[in-house]
Amino acid sequence: IPGKKYFIDINKLVKPFSTKSVANSYNALDVKFCELKVPDGFKVNIFANNLQNPRNIKVSENGDVFVAESRTGRIKILRDTNSDGVSDLHKVFAKGFNKPFGIEINSEYLFIADVDYLWKIPYRLGQLRADSKPIKLTKSKALGESNGHWTRNIVLLNNKIYISVGSRGNIGIEDNPRATIQEFDIKTNEQKIFATGLRNPIGIDVHPITKKIFTVVNERDGMGDRLVPDYFTQVEKGDFFGWPFFYLGNNTQPHIDVPHKYKNSVVKKPDVLFKSHSGPIDLIFYNKKQFPDELYG
């Protein structure tokens, strides 16, 4: 509900199964009936339409908007050539991917993560079409199988790409790299586990000042309408957030045997909780100067 404030105390969670589980389906509405509610002084308009399953975007330094059309396997560029707030140039930059999602850019390459690989394509600022074929950076299955949570989001920091990989299922023991954030060195092509126990860390970003990694996580279902809260949190190398054996600290997941090596694990508590089953799907740190002063800090 826009404007409503929620406070969820991690030390006062309800007990598992103490609230009923609720299943809600979505209703697809015509865009003219779906005006976003925004604070006074803000305005939202349609920047682009008639896209096919757009799932993620990345804005380049010159304002070009890269869009992952996941179902079609394409990366598009949207450009506003007359600065009226509406894109008037749409081009397919590259295609042939398997459900592309994550997009990142540096001074030399456009990086793309799909369910099969992390890719790179030579890129010059302002370029509208790829001049060469995408280059595979990871090995086969290095980002897991395509079943379950299929989005592979990425963020670039100091020549390393951090890749969020969700679990295959709701609760279960799964092999790496499922339910992790992976760290990939673009200079050496070395891949390591960065953090674990994250059921679906679908959104990921770098704080512009501290240069720390943050993520939003979609938590598990099946324990009632008020468990388990989704969350936003900073992530450090080696962190374990509990899934599937624990949640929100050392709260034990019912009906699953905890292997001996996890019984004394230090489970990191997340920083900010969202209402259970909210399903946050991304985050971005705003570092521009258009917003009122009270919205900074």
Regions found by a protein language model. Name each.
Residues 89-90, 99, 104-106, 116-157, ...:
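Asp-box/WD-like beta-propeller blade repeats and closely related beta-sheet repeat scaffolds
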Residues 78-83, 121-129, 235-242:
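Short loop/turn segments immediately following beta-strands, especially the blade-tip
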Residues 74-77, 109, 117-119, 180-182, ...:
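A short loop-to-beta-strand structural motif that recurs across blades of beta-propeller domains
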Residues 72, 87, 115, 131, ...:
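A detector of repeated loop/turn-to-beta-strand junctions in beta-rich toroidal repeat architectures
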